[in-house]
Regions:
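N-terminal, post-signal-peptide region of Sec/Tat-exported proteins
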Residues: 48-80
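A general boundary/transition motif marking the beginning of the first structured unit of a protein
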Residues: 1-2, 94
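Short N-terminal helix-initiation segments at or just after the protein's N-terminus
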Residues: 1, 24-27
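Mature, soluble, non-transmembrane domains
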Residues: 23-25, 37-39, 50, 70, ...
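N-terminal signal peptide c-region/cleavage motif recognized by signal peptidases
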Residues: 18-20
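Short, linear, compositionally biased motifs with a strong N-terminal bias
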Residues: 14-15
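A short, Trp-centered hydrophobic/proline-enriched beta-strand micro-motif
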Residues: 26-44
Length: 158
């Protein structure tokens, strides 16, 4: 009896270790300052712009700004990526039901790992060009984030 309990504990520990090791392999790594081009499509409308995310020891803070410099929304992301809070949402999107869907989609997007992700109404895909796309089929929303290469860092490295 004791031997089988030990085996069960050892097996469950190995499974837990394997899943936590894979959990750190996120599609969107957030270290320091990250910049992405972003496109959010919803039923014939599209919001395009830039997403800037800064990460420190307390978590991540981000902003989505359109081409004209208007803040669409700001957000915070906890260090373990399990909590997303929307701040300063543009008036068109400042409805509780819209914020609830966007908050859930962003949480799902930032928690996505390198393995194929599809959960119910949400699907995350990694494109060949390095962009990450989330599709919410229930509400017909599509989020696309493509990393912006920092040319200033490339020039200083040479």
């Amino acid at each position: 009896m004791e031997r089988s309990m030990r085996r069960c504990l050892l097996l469950s520990s190995l499974i837990w270790l394997a899943t936590t090791a894979l959990a750190g392999d996120y599609l969107l790594p957030l270290e320091g300052r990250q910049q992405f081009t972003v496109a959010i499509s919803a039923r014939g409308m599209e919001l395009t712009g830039v997403c800037i995310i800064k990460t420190d020891e307390t978590g991540s803070r981000g902003a989505i700004v359109n081409e004209f410099g208007v803040h669409a929304l700001d957000f915070t992301l906890s260090q373990n990526r399990k909590k997303v809070k929307l701040l300063n949402v543009i008036d068109v999107m400042n409805r509780w039901y819209i914020k609830k869907v966007v908050r859930g989609d962003l949480k799902y997007l930032f928690q996505a790992t390198a393995s194929p992700q599809s959960k119910g109404r949400r699907t995350v895909m990694l494109e060949d060009d390095g962009s990450v796309t989330l599709e919410n089929t229930k509400y017909r929303l599509r989020y696309s984030l493509k990393p912006i290469k920092n040319t200033q860092d490339d020039e200083t490295a040479e």
